[in-house]
Amino acid sequence: MAARGRRAEPPGREAPGPAGSGRSRWAESGPGTSPESGDDEVSGSSPVSSGVNLFANDGSFLELFKRKMEEEQRQRQEEPPPGPQRPDPPASAAAGPGNPKRKGGPGPTLSFVGKRRGGNKLALKTGIVAKKQKTEDEVLTSKGDAWAKYMAEVKKYKAHQCGDDDKTRPLVK
């Protein structure tokens, strides 16, 4: 068990002994430098994985990226597209005795999948709904100031709630 106040060293690295200089081996060996003892241990799969940035912050990455993309586009253009390519047969071979040649192209048959049939007769008519006529109160409230709007709303609710004579409200479900 390590003494209190000391950092635990990772496996493969030893804590400095009494004969050591008092500094840890980590402080002496930075990323990319070899340990003091001279043995060529590499802790990791590659020395590049030490977390050091390979690109300088001078805009060179963008240039490299653009060059790489241009090269890929050139390669795509040079390569033929994947898929079966059939050479067009000569017209005389296509019009042989077993193959009558079509003159009209794809033909008059069209797919009706997903299409409306029947033209405009079956389509719903939209935008023809008659507008609701405004009542006199609504016309007054639209023109008037805030107080007139408030009073019109109060009148509307009083008409629905109760009469002044019997002070009863109609049943509400």
From Swiss-Prot:
Its EC number is 3.1.13.-. It is an enzyme of class 3 (hydrolase). The modification N6-acetyllysine is found at residue 143. Residues 14-23, 43-52 have a biased composition (Low complexity). One of its GO terms (biological process) is rRNA catabolic process. Residues 1-12, 64-79 have a biased composition (Basic and acidic residues). Residues 1-119 are annotated as: Disordered. Residues 80-90 have a biased composition (Pro residues). GO terms for molecular function: 3'-5' exonuclease activity; 5'-3' exonuclease activity; RNA binding. Keywords: Acetylation, Exonuclease, Hydrolase, Nuclease, RNA-binding. It comes from the Eukaryota. InterPro entries: TRIR (IPR038838). The C-terminus contains a key domain which is responsible for the RNA digestion activity. Exoribonuclease that is part of the telomerase RNA 3' end processing complex and which has the ability to cleave all four unpaired RNA nucleotides from the 5' end or 3' end with higher efficiency for purine bases. Part of the telomerase RNA 3' end complex which contains about 488 proteins. This is Telomerase RNA component interacting RNase. The gene is Trir.
